[in-house]
Structure formats: C-alpha cells, structure tokens
Amino acid sequence: ALKAMVSKGFRNPVLRELYMFGVKNPDLKPERLWNYELSWTQRLAGGSVSYGVNLFYIKGEDIIRRGRADGRNILLNQARIENWGAEADAAWRIGGGWSVNANYSWLRMEYPVPASPEHKLYAGGDFGKGRWSVSTGVQYIAGLYTAAAPDPEVREAGFVLWNLRASLRVNRLLTIFVRGENLLAERYEINAGYPMPRATVFGGLKLNL
C-alpha cells in the first residue's frame, strides 16, 4: 500500500511558559509546523511477514526555546526545525510462539534538535508459550545531540541499549513480571547534564480486575 500525507500543526504555549518561573514570556506565539510523508507497506505469507518504508520532511517555525533578552534568560519564539529522513521496518511471525522485528530510522537535521538521534536501529524478538512470555530488544543510537542552540552543541557518542522482559500469567487476575533495562550498563545522556540509569532490574505484579 502506498500512502501520502500532508499535515499542518501548531502548539500553543502552555501556562508554565507564559506566566510561571523565571524564563516566562507572556508574548509567546504558537509554534507552527508542516509535515509531509510518503509511505509504502507490504504484507506477505498470509500476513506473517510485513515490511515498510517511510520518507518524511518536517518544517517548523516559531519553536519555543530558551534564549536571552535584556541580559536575562527568557523563552522566545526563536528556533526553527527543518528535518528530513527515512524509516524502515520489518516483522516476521515465525510460528510456534516466536516472532522477530527490526526497524531503522535516519534523520537529517538542518538545525540540531536535542534528544533526536540521527541514526536509530532496533532489533528484537518475542516468544510466548502458554502462560509464559519473553521479549528482548537491542537498540543502537548514534548522532544524538544532548544540547543545541542557544546552548553549546553537545553530541553523544553512539551507544547500545539491551532490554529484556519476562512475564508469567498466574491466572486471569494475576500476572508476575520482571524487566531489565540497559543491561549492558552503558553510560549515556539524552539531555546534557542528566545521566541515564545504568543496568536496572525490577519486577512486580499486575492485577487484571
């Protein structure tokens, strides 16, 4: 299936940006954005195999960012966004409770945007049998800006994240689960100055009432 889409969006400044805290600015204007997409998807083998490609272009103006005016920090409609790129994904339901999936995205930013990686690759798998289910995935991130204008640009080195989840459905009301995140204990930041947790494991109970 081939699809094309053009959309226009805007975001009004929230009360916090207009009137609260030291960087407030009651004169902020709405952010404006245009988005263009062209996508193609295909299913094979009775729907057990699927894959697709998506091309996009995004242009935005009056983006609200922190700046300086009269010697103080203040929020301003000073930033622009102009991004284009491509995304691809594929999935395969193998059978016997097994399935695998993968996706990749490439992003080109004319004006760097924090927390938006240029390259993102993911591969994962799932297995379910009876009351048990297990899923795992590995994600590679590269070209991630953790800070951008008006701050000095900071670009994170590439890193790999591995997550794992398992669950047991005890009965129709109770499910026990355990989850591990960043099991390779990578050191990385999404926003400059805020390190993300290293290897973390936790579990719990889920009630279905």
What function would you assign to each model-found segment?
Residues 59-61, 95, 140-149, 155, ...:
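C-terminal beta-signal and adjacent terminal beta-strands/loops
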Residues 38-42, 88-92, 123-127, 136, ...:
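Residues on the lipid-exposed face of transmembrane beta-strands in outer-membrane beta-barrel proteins
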Residues 50-60, 76-148, 173-175, 184:
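Gram-negative outer-membrane beta-barrel transporters
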Residues 5-61, 67-93, 113-118, 155-157:
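Outer-membrane beta-barrel signature, preferentially recognizing the C-terminal barrel domain
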Residues 9, 110-116, 189-198:
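Solvent-exposed loop/turn segments connecting transmembrane beta-strands
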Residues 1-2:
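Transmembrane-helix signature of polytopic, membrane-embedded enzymes
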